[in-house]
C-alpha cells in the first residue's frame, strides 16, 4: 500500500504542474489507470511471484548445499589420499632402510663366506704342497735307492746308505 501511495505522490507533480496548452491531454486519467492496473496485477500475482521466488531460492539453496557436500566429500577424499600418500612414503622409506640393512648383512655374509673359502683354499694348498713335497721326496729316495741298488760298482754299507738317504731327504 505504501508503494502505491509513493508512486502516486511521485507522479502527482507531473499531473499538477503540467501546463495546459492548446491541446487537452488525459495524462491524469492514464496515470490513475496505470496505478489501478499495477495494483490489480500486484494483488493477483503477488502470492504466485513470492512463491515462485521462494521456491527458486530453496532450489538454489538445495543445489548450493549439494555442491558444498560434493566439495566437502572431494576435500575428504583429497585428505585421505594425502594421508595414504604419506603412509606410502613412510612405508617406502622403511622398505628402503630394510633393504639397505639386508644388503649390508648379505655383503657381510658373502664377505665372511669368501674369507672362509680363501682360508680353506690356502689350507688345502698348503696340505697339497706338503703332500706333493713328500711324494717328491719319496720319489727321489726311491730313485736314489734304485740307482744305488742297481749299480754294482758302488758298495755301501747299511749305515752309509741311510746317511745318504737322510742327506737327500733333508
UniProtKB/Swiss-Prot annotation:
Belongs to the ATPase B chain family. GO terms for molecular function: proton-transporting ATP synthase activity, rotational mechanism. The chain crosses the membrane at residues 4-24. InterPro entries: ATP_synth_b/b'su_bac/chlpt. Keywords: ATP synthesis, Cell inner membrane, Cell membrane, CF(0), Hydrogen ion transport, Ion transport, Membrane, Transmembrane, Transmembrane helix, Transport. One of its GO terms (cellular component) is plasma membrane. This is ATP synthase subunit b. The gene is atpF. F-type ATPases have 2 components, F(1) - the catalytic core - and F(0) - the membrane proton channel. F(1) has five subunits: alpha(3), beta(3), gamma(1), delta(1), epsilon(1). F(0) has three main subunits: a(1), b(2) and c(10-14). The alpha and beta chains form an alternating ring which encloses part of the gamma chain. F(1) is attached to F(0) by a central stalk formed by the gamma and epsilon chains, while a peripheral stalk is formed by the delta and b chains. It is found in: Cell inner membrane. It is a single-pass membrane protein. It comes from Aliarcobacter butzleri (strain RM4018) (Arcobacter butzleri). The keyword Transmembrane helix applies. It comes from the Bacteria. Signal peptide: none annotated. Its main location: membrane.
Amino acid at each position: 500500500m505504501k508503494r502505491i501511495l509513493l508512486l502516486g505522490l511521485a507522479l502527482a507533480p507531473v499531473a499538477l504542474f503540467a501546463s495546459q496548452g492548446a491541446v487537452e491531454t488525459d495524462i491524469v486519467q492514464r496515470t490513475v489507470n496505470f496505478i489501478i492496473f499495477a495494483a490489480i496485477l500486484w494483488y493477483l500475482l503477488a502470492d504466485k511471484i513470492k512463491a515462485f521466488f521462494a521456491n527458486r531460492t530453496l532450489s538454489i539453496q538445495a543445489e548450493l548445499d549439494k555442491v558444498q557436500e560434493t566439495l566437502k566429500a572431494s576435500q575428504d577424499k583429497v585428505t585421505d589420499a594425502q594421508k595414504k600418500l604419506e603412509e606410502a612414503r613412510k612405508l617406502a622409506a622403511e622398505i628402503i632402510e630394510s633393504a639397505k640393512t639386508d644388503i649390508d648383512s648379505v655383503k657381510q655374509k658373502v664377505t665372511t663366506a669368501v674369507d672362509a673359502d680363501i682360508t680353506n683354499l690356502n689350507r688345502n694348498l698348503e696340505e697339497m704342497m706338503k703332500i706333493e713335497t713328500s711324494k717328491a721326496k719319496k720319489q727321489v729316495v726311491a730313485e736314489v735307492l734304485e740307482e744305488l741298488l742297481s749299480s754294482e760298482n758302488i758298495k755301501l754299507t747299511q749305515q752309509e746308505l741311510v746317511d745318504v738317504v737322510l742327506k737327500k731327504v733333508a
